[in-house]
Amino acid sequence: MDAHFVGEVDVRWLVESGEDRKMQLLSDFAFVDSNNVRWEAKKNDVIDGASIPEVIWSQIVGTPFIGDYRRASVVHDVACDKRMHTSKDAHRMFYEAMLADGTPQPRALLFYTAVRLFGPQWEKTVGPTSIKFKSTLLSSSPIAVLDFNRLEQALDEVLGVDNK
């Protein structure tokens, strides 16, 4: 089965001091990856959109709540908060969810690289163990230069991640 989203993102803004970016989900939402793993974002979970520094908001990168990566950012936010899988798995799911939602691969690779390098990192999980993703979906591209698996290996080396 192809990777897909389940449900619609329905949120309420939470009023707070400061950036005022947090939202509460009003209904369940999920992403089912190519391995049929269901990444849940439950009703009442709190999200804050894509963590894009304001200094690089533009037509190319986008803002936290506008862009073809919004739904992927919802399940990624929750995956990072709940830590049911390793950070590497959560970030790979984010990449796959962006592709499933129509994000062009160059942008999805840019966001994946940014989140692997500068996003949250953890190894131990609170729930299921690390999962293996189908490399065919993650590396398929009409542009041969954009090879996800090679990028991931390079990021693993930079981050000192042991590939088991």
Language-model regions: role of each:
Residues 1-164:
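Extended terminal accessory/targeting regions
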